[in-house]
Amino acid sequence: MSAKEVRFGTDARGRMLKGINTLADTVKITLGPKGRNVILDTSYGAPRITKDGVTVAREIELSDRFENVGAQMVKEVASRTNEEAGDGTTTATVLAQAIAKEGMKAVAAGMNPMDLKRGIDRAVAIVIAEIRSMSRPVGDSAEIAKVGALSANGEAAIGRQIADAMAKVGTAGVIKVEENKGLETETEVVEGMQFDRGYLSPYFITHAQKMVVELDDCAILLHEGKLTSLASMVPLLEAVVQAEKQLLVVAEDVEGEALTTLVVNKLRGGLKVAAAKAPGFGDGRAAMLEDLAVLTGAHLISAELGTKLETVTLDMLGFAKKVVLTKDSTILIDSAGDKAAIASRIGQIRNQIEDTTSAYNKEKLQERLARLAGGVAVIRVGGATEIEVKERRDRVEDTLNATRAAVQEGVVPGGGAALIHAGKALAGLKGDNPDQDAGIKIIRRAIQAPLRQIADNAGIDGSVVAGKVIENDSATFGFDAQLETYGDMLQAGIIDPTKVVRIALEDAASIAGLLITTEVIIAHKPERGERMSQMDEMGGMM
């Protein structure tokens, strides 16, 4: 086992706080409409320019192990907020720094860390309850566009594109963000269900110029296993031809004689047909095949379910008015599934989403839900250079996450105003002892930090701005950093998703509470080579 270094008390917290400040000071300059960019050096290719808080935080790794502990803990705030809310990472970082800074000062002054944390937790619960009471639902696409524009640093076009995409595919629909090769940012909406598997052979192509397969009035065979021979389903193929239908075969794989038979039938003109692999892997593949069966009205052919190819009849196939296959994807349009069965399947998946604790499983379930419930929209982000495209893509993804959060829990006045006004509910709140009172005061001060930072980044004294907002009795009064004016945030269209504000405060207080109650840090002792490297970085002063 390698040697370890141990730091106690004030020494440990001081080193940790230095790391916290290094990371937070780097991230918080990106906050607000006049926040600055950060350039990230990359190991290959051009440098990356971003205003995304969690992207900046992930790049920071400090050479001092004890300082790095503090930095990594605050990085965890940004990561957790990003995972839970999808936005608000910079706000969470600013809050965590403010709470940790004030809390460590209080501990150094001799206050009990555990009582401080109890006071902090009590105050946070009150503020969160007040934020929930201030929240109001998102009204329409225009309001969704406002949320999007704000998250995209005032770029209204991005907000409108996301609002339009949501209007078409539904708030539960899949919206993908990709990079475009052109200058423009475009939105393409796919009506129907799409999965990421394309045609198995280019011989199935029906439109050589577009390199796609298009099947109309299409029967769909869903098979859970591999198909290596079609001898047992010749009667079915004949029935499809007699019914003047076209055919899509979806299976774990179609290979050998089975694939050859389908290709020959297509080339001879006897049957317009295509084959694709089933989407997903393992248990996920079986679940997605069942989704496809419900959506298209098909019977899933599976040994486990007791169905065999030789017993399949025409009425066991699914149907869609149109199927489009590229080399990478398959789209089913206007499928013939029973609406009640589809609604029941959607309900099952929603229940599974609520029950699962795995972030990965939740993401996959949400993708399945979206495919069944809404459809698919693709936003292709354009730009003049690769660097610009990547920076814009970051902003579009943040905007998309913010709008989804707004739809889920509603919106509150933006620009840090909601936290300021919710904090007024702490007036007169008392803890069980003076140390808990100090914890409550820490939150009263810390929740001003995002507004102060937004103002500072706009070149205006944050203390003055915070004071004016606190003095006003209106719960919607705030500061518009873009125009450098005061007014009603809701009327100005400056709104934040309630979920983003709530989770940013919860996660910041949670991690900061752990930092405040830390008394000892144990870190790996640097090896000789590392110590020499650190001496070189300090100019060799020893």
UniProtKB/Swiss-Prot annotation:
Main subcellular location: cytoplasm
Q: Point out the gene that encodes the protein.
A: groEL2
Q: Which InterPro entries match?
A: Chaperonin_Cpn60_CS, Cpn60/GroEL, Cpn60/GroEL/TCP-1, GroEL-like_apical_dom_sf, GROEL-like_equatorial_sf, TCP-1-like_intermed_sf
This chain's protein is named Chaperonin GroEL 2
Q: Which GO terms describe its molecular function?
A: ATP binding; ATP-dependent protein folding chaperone; isomerase activity; unfolded protein binding
* Compartments where located: Cytoplasm
The keyword Disulfide bond belongs to this UniProt entry's keyword annotation: no
Instruction: State its Enzyme Commission number(s).
Output: 5.6.1.7
- Please give the Gene3D superfamilies that the UniProt record associates with this protein: GroEL, GroEL-like equatorial domain, TCP-1-like chaperonin intermediate domain
The GO cellular component terms are: cytoplasm
What keyword terms does UniProt attach to this protein?
A: ATP-binding, Chaperone, Cytoplasm, Isomerase, Nucleotide-binding
User: What Pfam families does the annotation carry?
Assistant: Cpn60_TCP1
